[in-house]
């Protein structure tokens, strides 16, 4: 008698869990999908209601007739809900993974149905496949510890404030340029005095409401700059304390010429502080600096870098790569760039600097993990 596909699937698929649980998260309601490997069950609960989660898990056990101490595995997509749910599930004895949503396979049709039930079913089926042995099915997020996640707030707040400062400065310039006026430094201490002396094209003072709006915008700008100054001082205070391993890594990075206060902090808190890279390929791939080939049949082309990961770290690494060429001209990496790319045009140099950034991150990782100084690099003298 021939075996059906379903029978073969059950026979040759290793069952690593008794109950699978997938979360489809949204603002007001969460969709929960359960399966014992054969049947499925879907329920809606109020968002962030932990009591309902425990209740539905118990009902799922009864539905699937699971008794005793069973193994439960779960998953949800990484997003704005962060990692608190992951930590809660682990505390409850549920083995949870957080999945990169961009790595989930979807239909390539021009139009495809999308509902919470369909998404929950898809997550649930992929979770069973993942624990059935398909480990490369999707990308699992490396969840930071609570302290590591907390330490990232300082540099991310500085990043947000810096964007806000640029917006305030541009808004002030835009309001004045509408009257044919231009100021060099909208955040200067004497800006208000300069504002009083400004005159329009016909010699008149600025309209009262416009002047009042510019003044309020200036006050908001000054407040943002004061907060940025406070955060920078707090950052230096923490580095001097060297209270954690991450802070000691920040101080270690600063011993290299070309690595400044901001870049050393961002690299450690976002990348080197708590992520466990196993090899140089993972280091280069994290900020999205690795190539993306397209080689199918007779079609072969390069699609550029993958641009995965945080754009801030990718942009910062390229910025620091240019600085490395300037402040470490005798290093092996700088000499390699000069030999391969310096003689070409601007386009060739831009391609080359991406390779420098990728290689530099690998060298910085080796320096922090194994104490190997980048070849030819100069260290700052101890003060």
Q: Where are these predicted regions, by residue range?
A:
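Gly/Thr-rich phosphate-binding beta-strand-loop-beta motif of the actin/hexokinase/Hsp70
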Residues: 10-35, 123
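Nucleic-acid-processing active sites and adjacent nucleic-acid-binding tracks
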Residues: 35-71
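Short glycine-rich phosphate-binding loop at a beta-alpha junction
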Residues: 69-79
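Short alpha-helix plus adjacent loop in nuclease-associated cores
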Residues: 97-140, 194-195, 299-308
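Glycine-rich, often acidic, oxyanion-interacting loops/wings at catalytic, nucleic-acid
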Residues: 151-252
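Low-complexity, acidic/Ser/Thr- and charged residue-rich accessory regions of DNA metabolism proteins
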Residues: 298, 338-383
């Amino acid at each position: 008698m021939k075996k059906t596909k379903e029978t073969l699937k059950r026979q040759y698929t290793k069952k690593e869990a008794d109950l699978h649980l997938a979360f489809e998260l949204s603002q007001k309601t969460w969709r929960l999908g359960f399966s014992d490997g054969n049947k499925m069950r879907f329920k809606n609960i109020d968002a962030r209601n932990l009591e309902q989660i425990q209740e539905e898990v118990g009902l799922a056990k009864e539905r699937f007739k699971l008794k005793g101490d069973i193994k439960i595995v779960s998953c949800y997509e990484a997003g704005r809900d962060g990692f608190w749910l992951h930590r809660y599930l682990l505390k409850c004895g549920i083995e949870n993974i957080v999945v990169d949503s961009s790595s989930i396979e979807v239909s390539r049709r021009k139009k495809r149905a999308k509902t919470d039930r369909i998404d929950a079913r898809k997550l649930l089926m992929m979770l069973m496949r993942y624990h059935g042995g398909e480990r490369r099915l999707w990308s699992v997020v490396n969840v930071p510890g609570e302290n590591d996640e907390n330490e990232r707030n300082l540099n991310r707040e500085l990043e947000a404030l810096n964007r806000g400062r640029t917006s305030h400065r541009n808004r002030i310039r835009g309001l004045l340029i509408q009257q044919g006026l231009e100021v060099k430094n909208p955040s200067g201490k004497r800006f208000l005095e300069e504002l009083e002396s400004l005159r329009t094209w016909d010699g008149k003072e600025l309209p009262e409401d416009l002047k009042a709006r510019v003044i309020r915008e200036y006050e908001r700008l000054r407040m943002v700059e004061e907060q940025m100054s406070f955060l920078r001082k707090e950052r230096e205070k923490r580095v001097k304390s060297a209270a954690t391993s991450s802070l000691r890594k920040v101080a270690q990075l600063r011993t290299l010429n070309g690595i400044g206060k901001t870049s050393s902090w961002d690299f450690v808190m976002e990348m080197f502080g708590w992520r466990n890279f196993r090899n140089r390929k993972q280091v280069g791939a994290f900020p999205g600096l690795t190539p993306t080939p397209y080689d199918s049949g007779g079609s072969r082309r390069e699609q550029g870098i993958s641009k995965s990961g945080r754009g801030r770290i990718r942009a910062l690494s390229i910025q620091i790569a240019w600085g490395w060429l300037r402040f470490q001209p005798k290093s092996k990496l700088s000499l390699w760039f000069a030999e391969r790319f310096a003689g070409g045009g601007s386009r060739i140099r831009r391609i080359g600097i991406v390779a420098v950034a990728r290689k530099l991150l690998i060298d910085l990782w080796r320096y922090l993990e194994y104490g190997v100084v980048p070849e030819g690099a100069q260290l700052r003298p101890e003060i």
